[in-house]
From Swiss-Prot:
Family: Belongs to the universal ribosomal protein uS11 family.
GO molecular function per UniProt: rRNA binding; structural constituent of ribosome
Gene: rpsK
Record protein name field: Small ribosomal subunit protein uS11
Biased composition (Basic residues): 124-134
Length: 134
């Protein structure tokens, strides 16, 4: 009989990153928070879907705050103290995520909105029809 090989989880290398960048990508469906060093190498991330929310609950500001909390805890293990925040998207979890970073003791040096704005590019998607069901 062949011996089954079990894969062991790799040990996470602890980096000593004091200053970094917090990327908050907030869409209409989800909020993704990623922490990277100044060169852009991501070392901690989380999203509303990754912490267990599904469907319409992912787009709430509360879910964005919980996703930010999970990402900040991972980032603090690497020694993160201060960040530059880059906000992208038009979702409702953008401000909640930024406030949660500040509330968890990370110093925010700068807040920058990097939402891409088209200069009359491709045609936008059609509008969502909302009907009154009575």
């Amino acid at each position: 009989m062949a011996v089954k090989k079990t894969k062991s989880k790799q040990k996470v290398k602890r980096k000593n990153i004091v200053s970094g960048v917090a990327h908050i990508h907030s869409t209409h469906q989800n909020t993704i928070v990623a922490f990277s060093d100044e060169a852009g190498n991501v070392f901690a991330w989380s999203s509303a879907g990754a912490i267990g929310y599904k469907g319409t609950k992912k787009k709430t500001p509360y879910a964005a705050g919980l996703a930010t909390t999970a990402a900040v805890e991972k980032a603090k293990e690497h020694g993160l103290k201060e960040v530059r925040v880059e906000l992208k998207g038009t979702g409702s979890g953008k401000d909640a995520a930024r406030k949660q970073i500040e509330a968890l003791g990370i110093i925010i040096k700068e807040v920058k909105d990097v939402t891409p704005i088209p200069h009359n590019g491709t045609r936008p998607p059609k509008k969502v029809l909302k009907r009154d069901l009575k």
